[in-house]
Amino acid sequence: MIEIRLHGRGGQGAVTASRLLATAAFLESKYSQSIPMYGTERRGAPVTAFVRIGEKEKMVRSLIHEPDYVVVLDPLLRKTVDITEGLREDGMLVLNSSIPPEEIELLKPYRVATVDATNISLKTLGRPITNTAILGAFCRATGEVGLDSVIGAVKQQWPGRLGELNAKAVEEAFENTHVGNPRIIEEMKRTVAPVESRADWRTFKPEVDVSKCTGCKMCWIFCPEHCIEMVEGKSVVNYDFCKGCGICAEECPVGAMSMRIESETEE
């Protein structure tokens, strides 16, 4: 039996990914469980889900504390969450990241697989919902379930065009997954943010082109989080509280605000 833990954020489809993975295993005549763990989280809040897959039926239904694999749908979660907690010594991390495995910093020599699931999802689906893309990476990196089985589960979940688009995301991620060994470090860097910070919730980050900003305050007026300030007549974003909703960029009449993928600005 193998045990898998998935980390994501509300709206990225971590719970659906666990169900799709369990369904794919079932299509291969294996026993499987999908176990979500979430409460009243809003979009952007951390979510965890679990999957068990085996050749024999297991009566245990508990949460998984020592997984064989950890799958991470959001590239920024590893800054604030201990994604390797309980991971077995010979375990593997499957990460949504645009950087190669050799540049991923970890405390232990786990195997690492990376894929730029965010960009793949944006290209195929038009939205940063990374659950199906990351399953393609899981197939390629682990071989625990077959690509055809995952695609079958996807098309069963979403018949028609949406299923075809998600199947394309699975296939493209499968072809663009890289597996390797991480860079071992002695101490993991952690981001310390204000208690009420929601900075790690966002996928996109607004950036201000000061040369274009006219100080019209449209972004300041429409920002739902009140995290834009006017400094010397120009817009300044307080990134500790920005959730990356993109309203500021939509409302800016001169194109001074633009949205960039957060992980690309950090990595």
Model-identified regions with their sequence ranges:
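Short Cys/His-rich Zn2+-coordinating modules
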Residues: 194, 200-206, 232-234
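Active-site cofactor/cluster-binding pocket
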Residues: 1-200, 211-214, 265-267
